Amino acid sequence: MLTLSTIDMLLAINEGQLIEEVIITLLASPQLAVFFEKHPRLKKALLKDIYQWKKSLQEKVKETLVPTIIADEFALYQQTQSLCNAVFNQQVDNILTELNQLDSSFVIEATQLIKTNKPFSPAQQALFIQRWRISLIFQVTTLHKALFEQEQEQLLAELQERLALSGSLSNTFSENERAAGRLWDMSKGVITKTPYDEKIIQRYSDFLNQQPELHKLASLLGRSKTAKSLPEESVIFESITIVEKAPDTTPEQVNGIGLSDDILRLLPAELALLGINEVEYEFYRKLIEKQLNTYRLQGDSWQERTVLRPVTHHLDEERPRGPFIICIDTSGSMGGFNEQCAKAFGLALMKIALADNRACHVMLFSTEMIHYQLSSSDGLQELVKFLNQTFRGGTDLASCLNEVADKLNTPTWKDADAVVISDFVAQRLPENLINKIKKVQQQQHNRFHAVTLSNYGKPSIMKIFDHIWRFDTGLKSRLLRRWRQ
Protein backbone atom coordinates (compact mmCIF):
# COMPACT_ATOMS: atom_id res chain seq x y z
CA MET A 1 0.00 0.00 0.00
CA LEU A 2 1.08 3.55 -0.75
CA THR A 3 1.77 5.82 2.24
CA LEU A 4 1.48 9.60 2.40
CA SER A 5 5.22 9.89 2.88
CA THR A 6 5.93 7.91 -0.30
CA ILE A 7 3.51 9.85 -2.50
CA ASP A 8 4.93 13.12 -1.08
CA MET A 9 8.35 12.09 -2.30
CA LEU A 10 7.12 10.99 -5.75
CA LEU A 11 5.13 14.19 -6.28
CA ALA A 12 7.90 16.37 -4.76
CA ILE A 13 5.59 17.74 -2.05
CA ASN A 14 7.40 19.66 0.71
CA GLU A 15 6.19 17.68 3.71
CA GLY A 16 8.40 19.62 6.15
CA GLN A 17 6.80 22.94 5.20
CA LEU A 18 3.32 21.54 5.85
CA ILE A 19 4.40 20.34 9.31
CA GLU A 20 6.01 23.72 10.02
CA GLU A 21 2.72 25.48 9.23
CA VAL A 22 0.91 23.22 11.70
CA ILE A 23 3.40 24.05 14.49
CA ILE A 24 3.18 27.80 13.80
CA THR A 25 -0.63 27.66 13.85
CA LEU A 26 -0.54 25.73 17.11
CA LEU A 27 1.82 28.15 18.85
CA ALA A 28 -0.27 31.11 17.67
CA SER A 29 -3.42 29.80 19.35
CA PRO A 30 -4.93 32.25 21.88
CA GLN A 31 -4.78 29.70 24.71
CA LEU A 32 -1.01 29.36 24.42
CA ALA A 33 -0.45 33.09 23.94
CA VAL A 34 -2.21 33.90 27.24
CA PHE A 35 -0.34 31.14 29.07
CA PHE A 36 3.07 32.21 27.72
CA GLU A 37 2.49 35.75 28.95
CA LYS A 38 1.59 34.51 32.43
CA HIS A 39 4.32 31.84 32.77
CA PRO A 40 7.40 32.84 30.71
CA ARG A 41 9.60 30.13 32.26
CA LEU A 42 7.23 27.38 31.19
CA LYS A 43 7.19 28.87 27.68
CA LYS A 44 10.87 27.99 27.21
CA ALA A 45 10.24 24.47 28.49
CA LEU A 46 7.31 24.01 26.11
CA LEU A 47 9.25 25.27 23.09
CA LYS A 48 11.81 22.50 23.65
CA ASP A 49 9.08 19.99 22.73
CA ILE A 50 8.71 21.38 19.18
CA TYR A 51 11.29 18.96 17.77
CA GLN A 52 9.41 16.03 19.31
CA TRP A 53 6.12 17.30 17.86
CA LYS A 54 7.63 17.50 14.38
CA LYS A 55 9.07 14.02 14.71
CA SER A 56 5.70 12.67 15.86
CA LEU A 57 3.91 14.25 12.88
CA GLN A 58 6.51 12.85 10.48
CA GLU A 59 5.99 9.37 11.92
CA LYS A 60 2.23 9.80 11.53
CA VAL A 61 2.67 10.73 7.85
CA LYS A 62 4.84 7.64 7.31
CA GLU A 63 2.21 5.39 8.88
CA THR A 64 -0.87 6.87 7.14
CA LEU A 65 -2.00 5.03 4.00
CA VAL A 66 -3.29 6.88 0.95
CA PRO A 67 -6.96 6.09 0.06
CA THR A 68 -7.30 3.42 -2.64
CA ILE A 69 -8.94 5.79 -5.18
CA ILE A 70 -6.02 8.27 -5.00
CA ALA A 71 -3.48 5.43 -5.07
CA ASP A 72 -5.10 3.99 -8.25
CA GLU A 73 -5.21 7.42 -9.90
CA PHE A 74 -1.54 7.97 -9.07
CA ALA A 75 -0.66 4.59 -10.62
CA LEU A 76 -2.55 5.62 -13.79
CA TYR A 77 -0.67 8.95 -13.75
CA GLN A 78 2.68 7.15 -13.58
CA GLN A 79 1.72 4.87 -16.51
CA THR A 80 0.63 7.85 -18.61
CA GLN A 81 3.92 9.65 -17.89
CA SER A 82 5.87 6.90 -19.65
CA LEU A 83 3.79 6.96 -22.89
CA CYS A 84 5.23 8.39 -26.08
CA ASN A 85 3.20 11.03 -27.94
CA ALA A 86 1.67 8.64 -30.51
CA VAL A 87 0.55 6.08 -27.92
CA PHE A 88 -0.72 8.85 -25.66
CA ASN A 89 -3.00 10.16 -28.45
CA GLN A 90 -4.32 6.62 -29.03
CA GLN A 91 -5.11 5.99 -25.34
CA VAL A 92 -6.17 9.45 -24.17
CA ASP A 93 -9.89 8.58 -24.39
CA ASN A 94 -9.34 5.41 -22.33
CA ILE A 95 -7.43 7.50 -19.76
CA LEU A 96 -10.39 9.87 -19.50
CA THR A 97 -12.77 6.92 -19.02
CA GLU A 98 -10.64 5.56 -16.17
CA LEU A 99 -10.52 9.00 -14.55
CA ASN A 100 -14.34 9.06 -14.65
CA GLN A 101 -14.49 5.63 -13.04
CA LEU A 102 -12.13 6.81 -10.28
CA ASP A 103 -14.27 9.93 -9.76
CA SER A 104 -11.13 12.03 -10.07
CA SER A 105 -11.25 15.77 -9.46
CA PHE A 106 -9.14 16.13 -12.61
CA VAL A 107 -11.94 14.80 -14.92
CA ILE A 108 -13.46 18.19 -15.78
CA GLU A 109 -10.13 19.82 -16.62
CA ALA A 110 -8.96 16.70 -18.53
CA THR A 111 -12.14 16.70 -20.65
CA GLN A 112 -11.63 20.36 -21.53
CA LEU A 113 -7.98 19.79 -22.47
CA ILE A 114 -8.87 16.81 -24.71
CA LYS A 115 -11.59 18.77 -26.54
CA THR A 116 -9.28 21.72 -27.09
CA ASN A 117 -5.99 20.02 -27.96
CA LYS A 118 -6.72 16.59 -29.49
CA PRO A 119 -4.57 15.37 -31.14
CA PHE A 120 -1.92 16.40 -28.59
CA SER A 121 1.45 17.70 -29.61
CA PRO A 122 4.41 16.78 -27.31
CA ALA A 123 4.15 20.19 -25.62
CA GLN A 124 0.39 19.82 -25.12
CA GLN A 125 0.94 16.30 -23.74
CA ALA A 126 3.45 17.71 -21.22
CA LEU A 127 0.87 20.37 -20.24
CA PHE A 128 -1.76 17.64 -19.70
CA ILE A 129 0.62 15.66 -17.44
CA GLN A 130 1.60 18.80 -15.53
CA ARG A 131 -2.02 19.82 -14.86
CA TRP A 132 -2.77 16.27 -13.71
CA ARG A 133 0.18 16.38 -11.30
CA ILE A 134 -1.11 19.66 -9.83
CA SER A 135 -4.51 18.03 -9.29
CA LEU A 136 -2.89 15.08 -7.48
CA ILE A 137 -0.80 17.43 -5.32
CA PHE A 138 -3.96 19.28 -4.32
CA GLN A 139 -5.69 16.01 -3.33
CA VAL A 140 -2.68 14.79 -1.31
CA THR A 141 -2.28 18.19 0.38
CA THR A 142 -5.96 18.06 1.37
CA LEU A 143 -5.29 14.66 2.97
CA HIS A 144 -2.38 16.17 4.86
CA LYS A 145 -4.48 19.03 6.17
CA ALA A 146 -7.23 16.69 7.36
CA LEU A 147 -4.67 14.50 9.12
CA PHE A 148 -2.80 17.45 10.65
CA GLU A 149 -5.99 19.15 11.83
CA GLN A 150 -6.92 15.99 13.72
CA GLU A 151 -3.42 15.70 15.21
CA GLN A 152 -3.41 19.41 16.04
CA GLU A 153 -6.68 19.13 17.96
CA GLN A 154 -5.36 16.18 19.97
CA LEU A 155 -2.06 17.92 20.66
CA LEU A 156 -3.78 21.15 21.69
CA ALA A 157 -6.10 19.24 24.04
CA GLU A 158 -3.09 17.51 25.62
CA LEU A 159 -1.22 20.81 25.90
CA GLN A 160 -4.17 22.51 27.56
CA GLU A 161 -4.28 19.79 30.23
CA ARG A 162 -0.53 20.02 30.81
CA LEU A 163 -0.63 23.82 30.81
CA ALA A 164 -3.43 23.87 33.37
CA LEU A 165 -1.53 21.50 35.66
CA SER A 166 1.86 23.18 35.19
CA GLY A 167 0.35 26.64 35.62
CA SER A 168 -1.32 25.71 38.90
CA LEU A 169 1.96 24.26 40.26
CA SER A 170 4.38 26.78 38.74
CA ASN A 171 4.56 28.86 41.93
CA THR A 172 5.46 25.72 43.88
CA PHE A 173 8.10 24.21 41.60
CA SER A 174 9.33 26.82 39.11
CA GLU A 175 12.28 28.01 41.19
CA ASN A 176 14.37 28.45 38.03
CA GLU A 177 14.17 27.56 34.34
CA ARG A 178 15.55 24.08 34.96
CA ALA A 179 12.85 23.38 37.55
CA ALA A 180 10.19 24.75 35.19
CA GLY A 181 11.46 22.40 32.49
CA ARG A 182 11.36 19.40 34.81
CA LEU A 183 7.83 20.34 35.92
CA TRP A 184 6.74 20.54 32.28
CA ASP A 185 8.28 17.13 31.52
CA MET A 186 6.56 15.54 34.52
CA SER A 187 3.20 17.00 33.53
CA LYS A 188 3.31 14.74 30.47
CA GLY A 189 3.20 11.70 32.73
CA VAL A 190 -0.04 12.80 34.39
CA ILE A 191 -2.69 10.85 32.48
CA THR A 192 -5.59 11.71 34.77
CA LYS A 193 -5.72 14.79 36.94
CA THR A 194 -8.23 15.82 39.58
CA PRO A 195 -8.52 19.10 41.46
CA TYR A 196 -7.78 17.12 44.64
CA ASP A 197 -4.31 16.22 43.32
CA GLU A 198 -3.42 19.86 42.83
CA LYS A 199 -5.07 20.81 46.11
CA ILE A 200 -2.98 18.48 48.28
CA ILE A 201 0.28 19.64 46.67
CA GLN A 202 -0.74 23.26 47.14
CA ARG A 203 -1.78 22.57 50.74
CA TYR A 204 1.65 21.25 51.70
CA SER A 205 3.33 24.05 49.76
CA ASP A 206 1.33 26.59 51.77
CA PHE A 207 2.22 24.76 54.98
CA LEU A 208 5.91 24.94 54.05
CA ASN A 209 5.61 28.69 53.47
CA GLN A 210 4.03 29.03 56.92
CA GLN A 211 7.07 27.31 58.46
CA PRO A 212 9.99 29.49 57.27
CA GLU A 213 12.46 27.81 59.65
CA LEU A 214 11.59 24.39 58.23
CA HIS A 215 11.93 25.76 54.71
CA LYS A 216 15.29 27.34 55.57
CA LEU A 217 16.47 24.07 57.13
CA ALA A 218 15.60 22.14 53.96
CA SER A 219 17.38 24.75 51.84
CA LEU A 220 20.52 24.60 54.01
CA LEU A 221 20.58 20.81 53.86
CA GLY A 222 19.85 20.66 50.14
CA ARG A 223 22.38 23.30 49.14
CA SER A 224 25.13 22.25 51.56
CA LYS A 225 28.60 21.76 50.08
CA THR A 226 30.47 19.78 52.67
CA ALA A 227 34.11 19.29 51.71
CA LYS A 228 35.76 15.91 52.07
CA SER A 229 39.43 15.92 53.15
CA LEU A 230 41.61 13.19 51.76
CA PRO A 231 45.06 13.49 53.42
CA GLU A 232 47.71 11.62 51.50
CA GLU A 233 51.51 11.57 51.78
CA SER A 234 53.10 12.67 48.56
CA VAL A 235 56.12 10.82 47.17
CA ILE A 236 56.96 13.80 44.97
CA PHE A 237 59.72 16.18 46.07
CA GLU A 238 58.95 19.85 45.69
CA SER A 239 61.60 22.52 45.19
CA ILE A 240 61.72 25.36 47.71
CA THR A 241 63.98 28.43 47.92
CA ILE A 242 65.86 29.10 51.16
CA VAL A 243 68.15 32.02 52.17
CA GLU A 244 71.41 31.14 53.93
CA LYS A 245 74.71 32.82 54.95
CA ALA A 246 77.64 32.02 52.60
CA PRO A 247 81.24 33.29 52.33
CA ASP A 248 81.73 36.16 49.91
CA THR A 249 84.66 38.12 48.46
CA THR A 250 83.30 41.40 49.68
CA PRO A 251 86.20 43.14 51.56
CA GLU A 252 85.00 43.49 55.12
CA GLN A 253 87.95 42.32 57.29
CA VAL A 254 91.47 40.81 57.01
CA ASN A 255 91.20 37.09 56.97
CA GLY A 256 94.88 36.13 56.34
CA ILE A 257 97.64 36.33 53.71
CA GLY A 258 97.49 34.84 50.24
CA LEU A 259 99.07 34.96 46.76
CA SER A 260 97.47 37.20 44.10
CA ASP A 261 98.17 40.12 41.75
CA ASP A 262 96.13 42.65 43.76
CA ILE A 263 98.54 45.62 44.07
CA LEU A 264 96.22 47.49 46.44
CA ARG A 265 96.61 44.73 49.03
CA LEU A 266 100.39 44.20 48.75
CA LEU A 267 102.42 43.45 51.84
CA PRO A 268 105.09 46.12 52.59
CA ALA A 269 107.87 43.54 52.01
CA GLU A 270 106.68 42.87 48.45
CA LEU A 271 106.36 46.58 47.76
CA ALA A 272 110.00 47.08 48.85
CA LEU A 273 111.19 44.82 46.00
CA LEU A 274 109.93 47.37 43.53
CA GLY A 275 112.38 49.98 44.90
CA ILE A 276 115.53 47.82 44.46
CA ASN A 277 116.88 47.78 40.89
CA GLU A 278 118.45 44.32 41.19
CA VAL A 279 115.14 42.59 42.11
CA GLU A 280 112.67 44.83 40.21
CA TYR A 281 112.26 42.22 37.47
CA GLU A 282 111.54 39.58 40.14
CA PHE A 283 108.61 41.76 41.31
CA TYR A 284 107.17 41.90 37.78
CA ARG A 285 107.53 38.11 37.42
CA LYS A 286 105.52 37.53 40.62
CA LEU A 287 102.93 40.05 39.46
CA ILE A 288 102.43 38.22 36.15
CA GLU A 289 102.29 34.84 37.86
CA LYS A 290 100.01 36.19 40.63
CA GLN A 291 102.50 35.13 43.27
CA LEU A 292 102.69 38.36 45.23
CA ASN A 293 102.01 38.15 48.95
CA THR A 294 98.82 40.14 49.62
CA TYR A 295 96.33 40.60 52.42
CA ARG A 296 93.26 38.32 52.01
CA LEU A 297 90.01 40.20 52.82
CA GLN A 298 86.68 38.40 53.12
CA GLY A 299 83.06 39.00 54.24
CA ASP A 300 79.67 37.23 54.58
CA SER A 301 76.54 37.57 52.41
CA TRP A 302 73.01 36.08 52.41
CA GLN A 303 72.37 34.03 49.29
CA GLU A 304 69.31 32.17 47.92
CA ARG A 305 69.61 28.46 47.29
CA THR A 306 67.03 25.99 45.85
CA VAL A 307 66.66 22.65 47.62
CA LEU A 308 64.27 19.67 47.31
CA ARG A 309 62.20 18.30 50.18
CA PRO A 310 59.22 15.89 50.53
CA VAL A 311 55.84 17.56 51.12
CA THR A 312 52.60 16.08 52.55
CA HIS A 313 49.47 17.20 50.68
CA HIS A 314 45.93 17.47 52.06
CA LEU A 315 43.48 17.31 49.18
CA ASP A 316 40.24 19.14 49.98
CA GLU A 317 37.73 18.38 47.26
CA GLU A 318 34.28 19.92 47.19
CA ARG A 319 31.65 17.24 47.60
CA PRO A 320 29.53 17.07 44.42
CA ARG A 321 25.78 17.49 44.77
CA GLY A 322 24.30 14.09 44.14
CA PRO A 323 20.78 12.65 44.29
CA PHE A 324 18.60 12.61 47.40
CA ILE A 325 17.45 9.44 49.15
CA ILE A 326 14.85 10.69 51.63
CA CYS A 327 13.84 8.21 54.34
CA ILE A 328 10.74 9.24 56.28
CA ASP A 329 9.56 7.55 59.45
CA THR A 330 5.82 6.80 59.14
CA SER A 331 5.34 5.28 62.58
CA GLY A 332 2.45 6.26 64.82
CA SER A 333 4.61 8.66 66.85
CA MET A 334 5.22 10.67 63.68
CA GLY A 335 1.54 11.46 63.14
CA GLY A 336 -0.13 14.85 63.34
CA PHE A 337 2.12 17.90 63.10
CA ASN A 338 5.24 15.74 62.68
CA GLU A 339 3.64 14.12 59.64
CA GLN A 340 2.92 17.51 58.11
CA CYS A 341 6.51 18.65 58.71
CA ALA A 342 8.02 15.45 57.29
CA LYS A 343 5.92 15.62 54.11
CA ALA A 344 6.57 19.35 53.66
CA PHE A 345 10.31 18.74 54.14
CA GLY A 346 10.20 16.03 51.46
CA LEU A 347 8.37 18.45 49.14
CA ALA A 348 11.04 21.11 49.79
CA LEU A 349 13.86 18.69 48.92
CA MET A 350 11.99 17.67 45.76
CA LYS A 351 11.85 21.35 44.72
CA ILE A 352 15.61 21.64 45.25
CA ALA A 353 16.20 18.42 43.30
CA LEU A 354 14.19 19.74 40.34
CA ALA A 355 16.00 23.09 40.40
CA ASP A 356 19.45 21.41 40.54
CA ASN A 357 18.58 18.57 38.14
CA ARG A 358 19.11 15.92 40.81
CA ALA A 359 17.26 12.65 41.33
CA CYS A 360 14.97 12.40 44.36
CA HIS A 361 13.84 9.09 45.85
CA VAL A 362 11.55 8.78 48.89
CA MET A 363 11.44 5.73 51.15
CA LEU A 364 8.66 5.55 53.73
CA PHE A 365 9.49 3.13 56.52
CA SER A 366 7.61 1.72 59.48
CA THR A 367 6.98 -2.03 59.63
CA GLU A 368 7.21 -2.05 55.81
CA MET A 369 8.84 0.15 53.18
CA ILE A 370 7.19 2.08 50.33
CA HIS A 371 9.21 3.71 47.55
CA TYR A 372 8.39 6.82 45.49
CA GLN A 373 10.58 8.15 42.66
CA LEU A 374 9.73 11.87 42.73
CA SER A 375 12.08 12.89 39.90
CA SER A 376 10.77 10.38 37.35
CA SER A 377 8.54 11.25 34.39
CA ASP A 378 5.47 10.49 36.52
CA GLY A 379 6.92 12.29 39.54
CA LEU A 380 3.78 14.37 40.15
CA GLN A 381 1.64 11.26 40.49
CA GLU A 382 4.26 9.77 42.82
CA LEU A 383 4.24 12.99 44.86
CA VAL A 384 0.46 12.89 45.26
CA LYS A 385 0.63 9.26 46.43
CA PHE A 386 3.36 10.19 48.90
CA LEU A 387 1.45 13.16 50.32
CA ASN A 388 -1.70 11.03 50.68
CA GLN A 389 0.14 8.34 52.64
CA THR A 390 -0.97 7.93 56.26
CA PHE A 391 1.52 7.49 59.11
CA ARG A 392 0.95 4.50 61.39
CA GLY A 393 2.74 1.39 62.64
CA GLY A 394 6.11 0.79 64.27
CA THR A 395 9.63 2.01 63.46
CA ASP A 396 12.04 -0.31 61.63
CA LEU A 397 14.92 2.11 61.11
CA ALA A 398 17.50 -0.67 60.79
CA SER A 399 15.87 -2.23 57.70
CA CYS A 400 15.59 1.19 56.07
CA LEU A 401 19.24 2.10 56.66
CA ASN A 402 20.36 -1.33 55.46
CA GLU A 403 18.48 -0.83 52.19
CA VAL A 404 19.89 2.69 51.84
CA ALA A 405 23.45 1.37 52.27
CA ASP A 406 22.80 -1.24 49.56
CA LYS A 407 21.32 1.42 47.28
CA LEU A 408 24.38 3.65 47.71
CA ASN A 409 26.55 0.86 46.32
CA THR A 410 24.75 1.02 42.96
CA PRO A 411 26.13 3.24 40.14
CA THR A 412 22.99 5.41 39.95
CA TRP A 413 23.05 6.39 43.61
CA LYS A 414 26.77 6.21 44.47
CA ASP A 415 26.98 10.01 44.99
CA ALA A 416 23.63 10.35 46.79
CA ASP A 417 22.95 12.10 50.08
CA ALA A 418 20.86 10.05 52.51
CA VAL A 419 18.36 12.08 54.57
CA VAL A 420 16.47 10.40 57.42
CA ILE A 421 13.48 12.30 58.85
CA SER A 422 12.29 10.84 62.15
CA ASP A 423 11.85 11.41 65.87
CA PHE A 424 14.55 8.71 66.28
CA VAL A 425 12.65 6.99 69.06
CA ALA A 426 13.63 3.52 67.90
CA GLN A 427 15.54 0.40 68.83
CA ARG A 428 19.34 0.32 68.84
CA LEU A 429 20.99 -0.38 65.52
CA PRO A 430 22.87 -3.68 65.05
CA GLU A 431 26.65 -3.39 65.20
CA ASN A 432 27.09 -4.92 61.74
CA LEU A 433 24.77 -2.27 60.26
CA ILE A 434 26.74 0.54 61.94
CA ASN A 435 29.96 -0.87 60.49
CA LYS A 436 28.31 -1.17 57.07
CA ILE A 437 27.27 2.50 57.13
CA LYS A 438 30.72 3.61 58.34
CA LYS A 439 32.29 1.69 55.46
CA VAL A 440 30.06 3.50 52.95
CA GLN A 441 30.89 6.85 54.56
CA GLN A 442 34.65 6.23 54.55
CA GLN A 443 35.06 4.55 51.16
CA GLN A 444 32.44 6.39 49.06
CA HIS A 445 32.22 9.57 51.16
CA ASN A 446 28.41 9.53 51.13
CA ARG A 447 26.79 11.89 53.63
CA PHE A 448 24.10 10.76 56.04
CA HIS A 449 21.83 13.56 57.32
CA ALA A 450 19.46 13.22 60.26
CA VAL A 451 16.48 15.57 60.48
CA THR A 452 15.15 15.05 63.99
CA LEU A 453 11.68 16.26 64.89
CA SER A 454 12.06 15.45 68.57
CA ASN A 455 14.42 16.12 71.48
CA TYR A 456 14.20 12.51 72.62
CA GLY A 457 16.16 10.75 69.89
CA LYS A 458 18.60 8.09 71.09
CA PRO A 459 22.22 9.32 71.03
CA SER A 460 23.45 5.84 70.08
CA ILE A 461 21.45 6.11 66.85
CA MET A 462 22.30 9.74 66.12
CA LYS A 463 26.08 9.22 66.25
CA ILE A 464 26.19 7.42 62.87
CA PHE A 465 25.07 10.58 61.00
CA ASP A 466 27.45 13.13 59.49
CA HIS A 467 25.05 16.03 60.11
CA ILE A 468 22.15 16.40 62.51
CA TRP A 469 19.49 19.00 61.71
CA ARG A 470 17.05 19.73 64.52
CA PHE A 471 13.51 21.03 64.17
CA ASP A 472 11.58 20.89 67.42
CA THR A 473 7.89 20.21 66.80
CA GLY A 474 6.91 20.56 70.46
CA LEU A 475 4.06 22.89 71.37
CA LYS A 476 6.35 25.40 73.08
CA SER A 477 8.66 25.68 70.05
CA ARG A 478 5.72 25.97 67.68
CA LEU A 479 4.24 28.83 69.72
CA LEU A 480 7.63 30.60 69.85
CA ARG A 481 8.02 30.32 66.08
CA ARG A 482 4.53 31.67 65.52
CA TRP A 483 5.20 34.55 67.91
CA ARG A 484 8.42 35.47 66.05
CA GLN A 485 6.50 35.65 62.78
Curated annotation (Swiss-Prot):
One of its GO terms (cellular component) is cytosol. Gene3D superfamilies: von Willebrand factor, type A domain. InterPro entries: Uncharacterised_CoxE, Uncharacterised_ViaA, VWF_A, vWFA_dom_sf. Keywords: Chaperone, Cytoplasm. It is found in: Cytoplasm. It holds the Pfam family VWA_CoxE. Belongs to the ViaA family. Homodimer. Interacts with RavA. Component of the RavA-ViaA chaperone complex, which may act on the membrane to optimize the function of some of the respiratory chains. ViaA stimulates the ATPase activity of RavA. This is Regulatory protein ViaA. It comes from Proteus mirabilis (strain HI4320).
